[in-house]
C-alpha cells in the first residue's frame, strides 16, 4: 500500500520532476515524462482527436506532433496536496463537437492516469490549438 508521496527533482540528465511514493517495501519514483506519455496516449485514443499539438516558439505556428513525440503537448504540474494537474494541447478533426470531445478527453485522462499511476488528478485542462480538415 502506498502511503505518502512527495515531489522531488531528479538528479538525472533530463532533470524531470519526479513524484516519489513511500511504501513498506521501498520507494517508487514516477517521472513527469510518464504522466505526459500516459496523458498523450489517453487523449489521442478519444474520438475526434487528430493528435497532440505543439506551438513553435520561433514561428508561432501550431504543429501536429508525431505519435512518438506527443508528450511535448502535455504539461504536468505537481500540487501541494499530492495531486497532479494536467494541461494538454490538441488538434481536433473538423465537424466534431469540440466541447463534447474535450469533456471526453478530461474524463479519459483522469481515469487512465489515476488507474496507471495511483495518483489523483486534480484538474485536466484541454486547449484546442487547431482544427484539421
Where are these predicted regions, by residue range?
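Glycine-rich active-site/cofactor-binding loop and its immediate structural neighborhood
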Residues: 110
Amino acid at each position: 500500500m502506498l502511503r505518502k508521496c512527495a515531489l522531488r527533482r531528479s538528479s538525472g540528465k533530463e532533470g524531470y520532476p519526479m513524484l516519489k511514493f513511500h511504501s513498506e517495501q521501498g520507494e517508487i519514483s514516477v517521472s513527469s515524462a510518464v504522466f505526459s506519455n500516459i496523458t498523450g496516449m489517453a487523449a489521442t485514443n478519444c474520438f475526434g482527436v487528430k493528435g497532440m499539438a505543439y506551438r513553435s516558439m520561433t514561428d508561432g505556428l501550431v504543429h501536429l506532433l508525431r505519435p512518438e513525440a506527443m508528450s511535448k503537448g502535455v504539461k504536468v504540474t505537481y500540487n501541494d496536496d499530492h495531486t497532479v494537474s494536467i494541461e494538454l494541447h490538441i488538434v481536433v478533426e473538423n465537424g466534431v463537437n469540440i466541447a463534447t470531445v474535450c469533456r471526453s478527453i478530461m474524463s479519459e485522462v483522469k481515469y487512465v492516469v489515476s488507474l496507471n499511476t495511483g495518483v489523483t488528478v486534480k484538474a485536466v485542462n484541454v486547449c484546442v490549438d487547431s482544427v484539421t480538415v
